[in-house]
Every structure is written in C-alpha cells, then in structure tokens.
Amino acid sequence: MSNLYTERVLSVHHWNDTLFSFKTTRNPGLRFKTGQFVMIGLEVDGRPLMRAYSIASPNYEEHLEFFSIKVPDGPLTSRLQHLKEGDELMVSRKPTGTLVHDDLLPGKHLYLLSTGTGMAPFLSVIQDPETYERYEKVILVHGVRWVSELAYADFITKVLPEHEYFGDQVKEKLIYYPLVTREPFRNQGRQTDLMRSGKLFEDIGLPPMNPQDDRAMICGSPSMLEETSAVLDSFGLKISPRMGEPGDYLIERAFVEK
C-alpha cells in the first residue's frame, strides 16, 4: 500500500443521476502534468480496488478533482457515487498519461475533443496558463446525449473567464462548443459528423482542420477515439505514435486498452 496516498474527500457534487464530481485533499508529494491521470480507489474486502481517473483540477491547485460516471453495477463507481465529505480515498503516487502538451508539435489552434466524462483531463488543460501561451485559440468540444450532462458549463463560461491571473486569456482564446445528440440544443449532432460536414468549423469561425495549424487531444469512449482519430487522419493530421514522440494529435491510450 506504500505506493498509495490516502486522501480525504472535501466535497461531492452530483450533476444529475448519472454524473458526479468530487474534490479531495492532495498530498504535497504528488506532482503531475496537466492532462495526466492517476489510479484512485477504495478498500474493498481488505484490498484496494483501483481504477484510472483523469485529474480534472489544474496542477497548481492544493486539492484534486475528479469527474465520474455512475455505473450502478460498476465495481468501483457503484461505491464512489456514495462518497461524502470526510470519507477516505486512495490515490496512486505515480501520475501518467498521454494527453500532455509536450507530445504535440507546435501549432496555432488546440482542439480538445471529448465526450461524457472524457472532458475531465481537458478541465485541467483549460485551467493551465501554459495552454494559452502555446496556442492562439483553444477549442473545447464536449459531446453528450442530454443537456443535463453538460457538466461544468457554467464554470467554463462564467467562472473561468473571470480568473484573476489568466481570465483575459480565456476570454480571448477559449472557444467552448457543447454538443447534444438526443434532445434539442443549439449545437446538435455528433462531433465527428459536424467536423466532416464542416459545420463545427463554420460555427466557431475557424477554417477546417489542417496539419499546419491544428493540434488536438481526444478523450472519450474507445469507439469515439477510433472514429475521431479517423476524421483527424482524413484532415492530414498524424497521431503521436508513443509517449515522448510528438505528433499532431493525441489520444489517451490507457483508456483505449481497457
């Protein structure tokens, strides 16, 4: 158990009946890069039950934040959803992950393409001042089924632009593009379809993606990663083949292989 920190739950927020977020204490020894994940878990029958979770908070915050789906029969999520303030949670000491700035070649626009709780690492990315130093525009696309699943929308549109240190950069550079597939909404449809048709780019006022200007990170279900990668490939972008070898776009490989 020495490779685990024991943290304490500070707060829990239920977005709807399928999604929730929680904040925990953070051991000062835990250092991570924006976009990375850790293993988190609970002790079940005397043994740690751990799963990979992206860190949704920026690396300078004193707490950790996680964004999770509720799976009624999921071994861990069925328990995590009942967390309350003061409960203990185990967090691995070694963060890792492929969604890191250094593995992207320099570019003008950064697309953060996510569905569901796949937005978690990008919440960390859009709170990192380095993101705005590297790019002229940062486009956060969040695809969900129902409007109630657009977690963090108020934080992204109202709180973050007022950040005392880099709020002006957010106002100038961050484009938030929420998408809903199963009920009426201003942006409707699947992001891959809207990218292929060009509508997504028209809506945000940027040209279609090209390998000279555009970089991307993708996080979502295995099928979403596969389909979105195919669209980026068709635009001429090349994936980073492995950690430490930069490319035009990145996917979180850890979640693909599960």
UniProtKB/Swiss-Prot annotation:
Binding positions for FAD per the UniProt entry: 51-54, 67, 69, 76-77, 117, 255, 257-258
Domain FAD-binding FR-type: 2-102
Cofactor: binding details: FAD and NADP(+) substrate form hydrogen bonds.
UniProt enzyme class: oxidoreductase
EC number(s) reported in the record: 1.18.1.2
A molecular function GO annotation: ferredoxin-NADP+ reductase activity
Induction conditions: Increased transcription under iron starvation.
Reactions catalysed, as given in the entry: 2 reduced [2Fe-2S]-[ferredoxin] + NADP(+) + H(+) = 2 oxidized [2Fe-2S]-[ferredoxin] + NADPH
Pfam families documented for this protein: FAD_binding_6, NAD_binding_1
GO biological process: cellular response to oxidative stress; heme catabolic process
Residues annotated as binding NADP(+): 144-145, 181-182, 190, 223, 227, 255, 257
Cofactor(s) it depends on: FAD
Keywords assigned: FAD, Flavoprotein, NADP, Nucleotide-binding, Oxidoreductase
Family, per entry: Belongs to the ferredoxin--NADP reductase type 1 family.
Quaternary assembly: Monomer.
Purpose: Transports electrons between ferredoxin and NADPH. Provides electrons to heme oxygenase (pigA) allowing anaerobic heme degradation. Provides electrons necessary to reduce and mobilize Fe(3+) in a heterooligomeric bacterioferritin (BFR) complex to Fe(2+). Reduction of Fe(3+) in a pure FtnA BFR does not require Bfd. Reduction of Fe(3+) in a pure BfrB BFR does require Bfd.
Protein name: Ferredoxin--NADP reductase
